[in-house]
Amino acid sequence: MSDRSDPTHAIWQKVLAALTADDRITPQLHGFISLVEPKGVMTGTLYLEVPNDLTRGMLEQRIRVPLLNAIGSLDEAAGVSNFAIVVNPGIAQDAFAQHPEPAEQPYIETPTITAPTDNPGLPASPSRGDSRLNPKYGFDTFVIGGSNRFAHAAAVAVAEAPAKAYNPLFIYGDSGLGKTHLLHAIGHYAISLYPGIRVRYVSSEEFTNDFINSIANNRSSLFQSRYRDNDILLIDDIQFLQGKDSTQEAFFHTFNTLHDHNKQVVITSDLPPKHLTGFEDRMRSRFEWGLITDVQAPDLETRIAILRKKAQSEKLQVPDDILEYMATKVTSNIRELEGTLIRVTAFASLNKTPVDLALVQTVLKDLITLDEDNVIAPVDIINHTAAYFKLTVDDLYGSSRSQAVATARQIAMYLCRELTNLSLPKIGQLFGNRDHTTVMYANKKITELMKERRSIYNQVTELTSRIKQNHRYGKM
């Protein structure tokens, strides 16, 4: 932090005053400016430090002209005619450390919740172990490309300086493009930078279920502390709250409490705020307070890099020309791309053959011919799976834990994940309102079994072929 008695500080305050009065500086841009530390003046240049490349880029591009105008309005005695930017990641940590947590204040009670009597046994705040972060999703495993570069930079900046630049950070894009990965990566990176920081990841479905349970069990205090006693709240698939007025009200108060206490909120959605239906205007406006960025389908180079990274992480030996071939054939999303790699290598492992072009073409012949504009309905997947295993649809929706039914259900969940753009919570809803973690487990288990058991691999492959052929030709 700069010394307030330093002449440089006085110069910077005058620059800030001019920028504050400039209509071109939006609240979002003010967030970037708030991260700047003036360091000194040398030969007419005002040197400024920022915590990351994203902030430097914004200052040198979108804010450059207003900043030069503000410098031009200074007295000649200031001796400043230009500025230079230096990136110093250390000031992000300093800034966060210099803002201690505010004193505890009573929360405003959500109108739809009746507050229970205080229970001294309730935890005061979530522990680090309760963050619910996936250890596989870090910035080190995220592949950066033109389709996600800005979203990645924004996510890194938020982790380095929570609630300092853009709050909330709102990331939108189609399913399977890396939004959830970025949420978890923010949490992991922030924890590595600030030991003891309180981070919680939650899907909107989980938030809704917790809210409903808190009403049913008269545990509103626990619900509030779980989501409000955090330094960073990461909420996935906010569109799931569409039309859920009471849950939106609970989230509205949670958001306000965190924002008012300078705590970071990061939100993902399949649509930008202005296109979200079923939300009150006041909620959508809060989504737009900070930075809005999107992730798009990866280009060819990025798809190749994603496959290469996945092969390395799974210790799979796949020639580069094979990775390039797969990348040219699977273009829709990252999830399908990685699933294709797993299926190819599983086939090679089961047959004890090398991964070559002929093998890839054989495995993918029924997977890569479907027009990506044609969307497979999850009900078709469920119907085909039930018929294939000689079960009823109710068996797959039901609670039976017999091995035959459970395996069929897990395969159906896996195929819904692979062949549709549905989120984990929505797939869970299809299967008797199961939790999204059940879908995650099913996806992981079937992926592993395909590598180990030829019967499972053959079943998944044959089912996939039948589903796609039926979709293509319109017959069961």
Curated annotation (Swiss-Prot):
Any single GO CC term annotated in Swiss-Prot or TrEMBL for this entry: plasma membrane
Region of interest (Domain III, AAA+ region), residue spans: 132-348
Residue numbers binding ATP: G176, G178, K179, T180
A Pfam family matched in the record: Bac_DnaA_C
Biological processes per GO annotation: DNA replication initiation; regulation of DNA replication
Stored SUPFAM superfamilies: P-loop containing nucleoside triphosphate hydrolases (SSF52540), TrpR-like (SSF48295)
Superkingdom of this protein's organism: Bacteria
Record's keyword annotation contains DNA-binding: yes
Cytoplasm found in the keyword field: yes
Record key words, sorted: ATP-binding, Cytoplasm, DNA replication, DNA-binding, Lipid-binding, Nucleotide-binding
Region (Domain IV, binds dsDNA): 349-476
UniProt subcellular location: Cytoplasm
Main localization of the protein described in the UniProt heading: cytoplasm
Subunit (UniProt): Oligomerizes as a right-handed, spiral filament on DNA at oriC.
Role noted for this protein: Plays an essential role in the initiation and regulation of chromosomal replication. ATP-DnaA binds to the origin of replication (oriC) to initiate formation of the DNA replication initiation complex once per cell cycle. Binds the DnaA box (a 9 base pair repeat at the origin) and separates the double-stranded (ds)DNA. Forms a right-handed helical filament on oriC DNA; dsDNA binds to the exterior of the filament while single-stranded (ss)DNA is stabiized in the filament's interior.
Domain-related comment: Domain I is involved in oligomerization and binding regulators, domain II is flexibile and of varying length in different bacteria, domain III forms the AAA+ region, while domain IV binds dsDNA.
Assigned protein family: Belongs to the DnaA family.
Name of the molecule in the record: Chromosomal replication initiator protein DnaA
